[in-house]
Amino acid sequence: MEEDLFSLAAGKQPSQQATNETAPRAGEARENAGTDHPGNAEDPAHRRIDYLRSELRRHNRLYYEQAEPEISDAEYDALFLELEKLEKAHPELSDPDSPTRRVGGAPLQGFNQIRHAVPMLSIDDIFEQRDAPVPDEELAEFYHKLSRALQTENVPVSVEPKIDGVALSIMYRNGKLAYAATRGDGDVGDDVTANVRTIRSVPLTLPPGAPPVLEVRGEVFMPNEAFAKLNEERDADGLPAFANPRNATAGTLKQLDPRQVAARPLAFLAHGLGAYEGPELRDAKDFWNMLRHCGIPCNEPVYYTDSLESTRQAVRDIDRLRHTLPYGTDGAVIKISSTATREALGATARAPRWAAAYKFPPEQKETTLLNIVVQVGRTGVLTPVAELQPVLLSGSTVARATLHNQDEIDRKDVRIGDTVLVEKAGEIIPAVLKVNLSKRPQDARPYSILEATKGLCPACGNPIMKEEGKVAWRCTNFTCPAQAVTGITHFCSRSALDVESIGSSVAEALRSSGLASSALDLFSLMPDQLANLNLGTPEEPRRYGEKNARKALDALQNARGLPLERWLIAFGIPLVGEVVAKALADTHPDLKHVADSPYLRDIVRLDELVEQAAKTNPNTRENKKAVKEGALSAEAVQERHQELMEEIDRLTAPYLATGYLRKNTAKFSYGSEIGVAAAKSLRSFFASAAGNHTMDVLHRLGINPQSQSYRASLLEIPAGSLSGKTFVITGTLSHPRDYFEQLIASHGGKATGAISKSTSCLLAGNGGGSKRDKALKLGVPVISEEDFYKMIGN
């Protein structure tokens, strides 16, 4: 990088086009995770580099696209730094798609995409290493690099707090907010204009004299006090707290319903500039003055320095001040002040050369883990939370830390009574890093969620379950009070009962007002109750209104007559999605028959019999050894195995005859989409207290959803024109995505979310670049909407 800086300072600037051409497109890094590199794949450094790239890509996807990070910033930074050092030491393993060359994640499919007028780059990090022998070593190295490039000892820079939020670009044209977009992959981001318009600190119009084109870069965040209040409310409602304000902000900003965004206290602060047409801005001071004139909220305080020592002092001042700021910050951003010098130094494909983010080391302290409590989230997931001896950490007293799940508890071997090291790196609920085993009490026992809860949900007392291959325990109760908001929202969703005017904000108001503690309570609502529902606050009330109330009640009345599969989806039973619900409707005339289904019973029983028969097979090594040693009788083993095989034959005969069960050597496969796991989940639900309560309530309401596709003969479903074909849908089409998914299913095909070699076709509208690129790379045909209609004979 030094050579680039010297050549740039001498006037050799790369064109903007060249910079853009080196920047990877959305999704490329993940798709190229297995790209071959020169060098020996058995070399330890090569293997470690491949591993780090793969892990960083995965964490980028979790952070930027799903807003569900698994690791802290400090852990991510450690992986990133290790990869950078290895790549510098092994230039022969260079890869233009490495995470060290990328900005962030791909745009979400739920939003339209916007191409940034000027690439929205990230900023390179420099670190203060904990207990480093030379303080601020990387800061000094960065400053000296700028000095050498500019051939001057003193470089004027600005220093400001690094906001721990979500990057956002807001475009103003002729004084009006034109659009707002997330960073995305740096070139293309998600259009979140409707959501950003609900943020009160963002001006929708600028005063006279504002630049005709002004693209402001900044951070959306949730103020600390508002975030603490939000978590207090969730705690009072028995909901798990958000891990940190950034997670809450990212999840809120990516809601598809702006009303949900408006209900959350988001704020915005500007710190940078994208496209610009207006009076010349000579330096950072001009930039900040222009923003203030326009009424755009600015990141403060800003320090102006012109030496290494004064820059160090500014960083120390921000470190002291950061716990008093109204938002989370984990560092200080250092930028060259002069606009002309910034343009001369330019940028790499990933970040500007004229700026760096100085990261403070996360604070760590030991404390005692007093207890572990299990909370039930709004989706039914059980989360273990450590209750700690209160300790002062990063300017606030903390007394709890999330332990995430049972696997995390087992991996760290966390036990009640342990002395644990906790870290707060931008986390409101700190992370438990590790256990100090030297201080472990002798009577400390391994912790089990299943044992601690006795297998029952702490919120409702119904059974909990863990799906195969998943890490989370989950409450299966459709009417669990802890899941009220999510349950009602899902119940009313388009794929379920399609009660359009009841979303999550209305569901939250219904729950908090006591009008509905579960989805089935909706059928007992009176028009005046719903019309007078307050969607605002006590200080600023906002009525739901008669029009919305009538609309919702009409939709609920219409829902009574919706087909069986829609109701099965509405219940939110684990593993029962649209495909399984349709198969259940094909094989059962109504809901009562599903609740007491011989078919589901037989699927579960067959699985048990096959497992028992495998254990009693006289030809297994274990049984032969037991017979030889006299522990088992050969005749008894053979007799029991024969009994089981005969019962299997009796059970499967009618299903084999109709084609709903097929046998390949000793294995069975199902002619419908109802597999063993889904059958077990359904049986568990209808046998539970929650399932019985659901059926009782529906009986009182006179509701017994009917199938519109029931085949009494249990014959094989006729193959359609798309039978055996798998489709992926991308881009903007003439109808919503679920319209095409239903068309595909009705013609015997299947719609999935991810491209693979087994995908038959990619149905592509406008946009959808990354999936289109991957389809072409894998040789998957890309078809238009017109091509698709021809395939189904329309």
Swiss-Prot record:
Molecular function terms, GO-annotated: DNA ligase (NAD+) activity; metal ion binding
Boundaries of every BRCT domain copy: 717-794
SMART domains: BRCT, LIGANc
Cysteine pairs bridged by disulfides in the record: none
Bias type Basic and acidic residues, positions: 27-47
Keyword Transport: no
Gene Ontology BP terms: DNA repair; DNA replication
Cofactor section: Mg(2+); Mn(2+)
Region listing for Disordered, in residue ranges: 1-47
Assigned keywords, A-Z: DNA damage, DNA repair, DNA replication, Ligase, Magnesium, Manganese, Metal-binding, NAD, Zinc
Highest rank taxon of the organism: Bacteria
Manganese keyword on record: yes
Recorded family membership: Belongs to the NAD-dependent DNA ligase family. LigA subfamily.
NCBIfam families hit by this protein: dnlj, PRK07956.1
Function: DNA ligase that catalyzes the formation of phosphodiester linkages between 5'-phosphoryl and 3'-hydroxyl groups in double-stranded DNA using NAD as a coenzyme and as the energy source for the reaction. It is essential for DNA replication and repair of damaged DNA.
Protein name: DNA ligase
Source organism: Akkermansia muciniphila (strain ATCC BAA-835 / DSM 22959 / JCM 33894 / BCRC 81048 / CCUG 64013 / CIP 107961 / Muc)
